[in-house]
Amino acid sequence: EAVVYFAMDVSSSMGERDRQLAKTFFFWVVQGLRRQYLHIEPVFVAHTIEAWEFPESEFFQVTGSGGTVASTAFQKVLEISTQRFDPSRFNSYVFYASDGANFQNDRDAAAAALAEIGKFANYVGYVETAAEQQQPPLGTETAMLFEQLEAETGLAGRYALTTPESVWDAIRAFFARPMEEAA
């Protein structure tokens, strides 16, 4: 059995374009997983300075305001994992979408929570919504946290979502490797 956590930043810095890119990525990932696997438990988390779990029908409609504290999303994933999806019984996959903004004083807490996720997750993916002209892509603090996890575990990846077309490139990049290994 597998659980797939979809966590999304819905803070003020995530504009409509950013949210649409993230939601499109998540929507197609969910559809693809449902076609490929019989037993997938999707979990949907959205956050600003706090994090909440949502039913799928509400997750794709959620918007928020305020600042960004990424560690709250990671802590919510850890909480749900502990309460409902024992990592010894479930393969766990985590996908996080953000524009990369995060309160500076949250860096250590976000790094610690992400490291805890890295201890049990089969794979952790990060998509960063970015403008096409943003240089360098994936140059944010949040992207660097995922780069560090990727270097430490080899079971993480990052991808910049810049256009609707890049959603498919991200899906191919993430699923070429982890899903083959999990099968």
Residue ranges and their predicted role:
Residues E1-A183:
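Acidic, glycine-rich A-domain
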